Amino acid sequence: MVRIAINGFGRIGRLVLRIALSRKNIEVVAINDPFITVDYAAYMFKYDSTHGRFDGEVSHDGKALIIDGKKVLVFQERDPATLPWGAEKIDIAIDSTGIFKELDSAQKHIDAGAKKVVITAPSSTAPMFVVGVNEDKYAGQTIVSNASCTTNCLAPLAKIINNAFGIEEGLMTTVHSITATQKTVDGPSHKDWRGGRTASGNIIPSSTGAAKAVGKVLPELQGKLTGMAFRVPTVDVSVVDLTVKLAKPATYEEIKAVVKKASENELKGVMGYTEDAVVSSDFLGDTHSSIFDAAAGIQLSPQFVKLVSWYDNEFGYSTRVVDLVELVAKN
């Protein structure tokens, strides 16, 4: 039984808790969030505007959440180094704050007594692992990153296509649902002026490092992909549009067949495949990292194609976080 703690009880932290509770080999011991009191944590965990009510009993005793009779301690420390991870025998701390995402800052969890750390954000210093893509390269590193939700969608698809046909170069666009960093009405956003505009009333062009990060988990694609994002007024579920120049000519039928085969074999559970006339809400709660939309892609020539793949940027990603925790626990 692996003992875990969750730092940061936001969208990802709460969903990671939901998913972890359903895994027999994981015990969630504690959560920490300096901005959330225990009674508020109970409320936020119980009710979710996007994914619905938690299917179980949720209460608290003033110090801990009580979920279906099981206690989960709640702390409110700003500095992770002061958390009692040693006393609580924490094997893996999951950091979903978006703040402690580099080796030096995530080290605070180790200093507090945790054995390992999984960061739920891309990192420029911690090694990044994408389940289904490069998790076989995990060699016991103490602090790891689960990359971003968009990299988790793009990388499995890019791996399949590159292995079968070769990718010479490509551009990615993610049409991405709103996230917590955006504004309900126009407000100050000094680093990203467009990002400060009303989330619910605009299509907002934005930057993303997700495509370049694929080169970190698939070195053979280093320098071959880049991309951008459009933030759109949907609450959850996003879609990747990958336009690539192939090294080897292929028909669209051949591409579909290769992706379908991978989704049923080595990437089962990570890569999905559909030929249905789907829209974004059809993927709410989908646990795949990426679901290939066979009916949406187009081909211009034997070596130039646009491929489309959906992802629940909250739930699919959080599922992979827990998968990575299990992998780290085994090694």
Swiss-Prot record:
Would I find Chaperone among this entry's keywords?
no
Its principal location?
cytoplasm
Q: Which residues carry this modification: Phosphoserine?
A: 148, 177, 200
One Pfam family hit: Gp_dh_C
Q: Into which EC class is this enzyme placed?
A: oxidoreductase
Q: Which UniProt keywords apply?
A: Cytoplasm, Glycolysis, NAD, Oxidoreductase, Phosphoprotein
**Species annotation:** Kluyveromyces marxianus (Yeast)
Q: Where does D-glyceraldehyde 3-phosphate bind?
A: 148-150, 179, 208-209, 231
Please state what the protein is called. Answer: Glyceraldehyde-3-phosphate dehydrogenase 3
The protein's location, in the record's own words, is: Cytoplasm
* Cellular component GO terms, alphabetical: cytosol; external encapsulating structure
What InterPro entries does this protein's entry cite? GlycerAld/Erythrose_P_DH (IPR020831), GlycerAld_3-P_DH_AS (IPR020830), GlycerAld_3-P_DH_cat (IPR020829), GlycerAld_3-P_DH_NAD(P)-bd (IPR020828), Glyceraldehyde-3-P_DH_1 (IPR006424), NAD(P)-bd_dom_sf (IPR036291)
Give me the residues that bind NAD(+), please.
11-12, 33, 77, 313
Gene name per UniProt: GAP3
Biological process (GO) annotations held by this record are: glucose metabolic process; glycolytic process
